[in-house]
């Protein structure tokens, strides 16, 4: 996962870097901290296998901003695109590269829109001059049906 930047604050304006440091100082680690998802590719594959999903599963290791630069890593089209990387730069890159691959009437789910200001800023900037309707899922999640 990418490191947060200054723009990446909570909805209350708290610095993400300070918040994560507080959690680490309290002994919260990567295994039980829901704010930081850290697991091996093997764990990811095991989780997909629980749901009998084995086909068309390609796991790509590395920072999203780098892995999305490699054309071979990209699918031809996307039906459901779920973004959950928290920060401005990663969300911005995901939208720039992946949203154009989202099929018409495909679904975009943004996990962190309501919580992290950086993710919200990236989404708002990307869709500034595009006519889309955003639906509120819950406090933090948002959904857009691709009509473009």
What is the meaning of each model-derived region?
Residues 1-148:
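S-adenosylmethionine/decaboxylated-SAM
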